Amino acid sequence: VPTETVYGIGADATNNWAVKKIFHIKNRPFNNPIICHFENLEKVYEHAELNSTALKLAKAFWPGPLTLILKKRKVSKISPFVSNNIDMKGCRIPNHPIAIKILKNLNRPIAAPSANISTKLSSTSIEHMDNKLKKKRIYR
C-alpha cells in the first residue's frame, strides 16, 4: 500500500490472526509495535484517547506523516498484538488516496508497518520492495 512516506503492508488491526501474520512475514519481533492507520479523526476517537495536545497536533498535521502515540480505549477492538499488550498505540491518518480508499472500504483501522523485512530499508517505491516480501501471502 502506498502512503506519502513509504510503501506499507497492512491487515485488519482488529484481527489477531492477521496482525500476527504481519509479524511473521516481516520477521519482526512481537515486542516491536506496529503503527495503526485510520480513515479519519472520528475513527481514531473510537480506539484511542486524545488529550488536548494530541488533538491540536492531529488537527494541525493529519492527514499526513505524523504518528501519535495514544492510549488505547478500553472499548477498542484493536488486537493486543499490535503493541505487545501495551495500552498505547501508534496512530496515524495517511495522506494518500489509495490508503484512504482501503481504510474506507475496510471500515476498520489497519495495522500498517513498512513493506520490508524487519531491519531492512523501507521501500519508497514498489520496485524497491524486497522480493522475499512480495512472494509471501498475507491472506488466508
What are the roles of these predicted feature ranges?
Residues P2-R140:
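Active-site-adjacent structural elements in enzyme catalytic cores
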